[in-house]
Amino acid sequence: GHVGIGTTGDPEVEALLRSRPELILKPLERWPDRLLGMFQLNAHDGPGSRDAIQRWLADGPMRGVYFPGGGPAAVTCTDRRVLPLVEQVVRLGAVIMQHTWYKTGGKQGLGESTPAELAELARRFPDHPFICAHAGGEWERGIRAIRGVSNVLVETSGFDATAGFIEMAVRELGAERIVFGSHLPSRSLGTELSKVIAANISEREKRLILGENFRRLLGVVD
């Protein structure tokens, strides 16, 4: 979600979120067992992001943070401005997800991150889990990039369902290092679910990927 620290590119939305934080807070408080919130950080605004971490993570109901790969808040995850924010989140034990994508021809935006760059960051915090959003898009390359960094998990959404993706991820990483993502509302939930449901893996592995792994990261106990 967005909490008014310049992540949307819409001044009116940003002003609304800053002036009426209850718009975000009330749904999380009403359905704490159904809504487990994460919010985007903006490394271009260090003070604002640090304040948001304190307000929404340390003192609030959020459970994790997301570093975007595009838009006004995008900063490559190896940038020095990202590190103090990661350190603050790690101290709180919260989930960290980083948008990652490999593009044909290389990066097209200054703030984009790749799985290899996330692996570089994650090596500095070997006891803290990081989620590699979208498995880098080009998932074969993405899986290989983070394979040797055991505290990095891949997330499944954002690219077309392709035979062999989940099977390779389970084979190379283990089912415990894969978390399901829907990418709603811009992707089809059925398509995203089919990546896991139709995969040639065990039912136990499917349960881990479809929810148990992420619940473990969040510290949610049934």
Per-segment meaning from a language model:
Residues G1-H2, Q40, I131-A133, E155-T156, ...:
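Short beta-strand segments
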Residues V3-I5, A43, G69-G71, Y102-T104, ...:
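Active-site-proximal loop/turn and secondary-structure-junction residues that shape catalytic pockets
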Residues T7-T104:
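Active-site gating/metal-coordination segments in enzymes
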Residues R18-E22, E112-P115, G190:
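Short, surface-exposed alpha-helical segments at coil->helix boundaries
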Residues G60-G64, T76-V179:
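Catalytic pocket-lining loop regions of alpha/beta-barrel enzymes
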Residues G174-R177, G190-D222:
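Mid-to-C-terminal alpha-helical segments outside catalytic/metal-binding sites
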Residues G181-L189:
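Short glycine/proline-rich, acidic loop/turn segments that cap or connect secondary-structure elements
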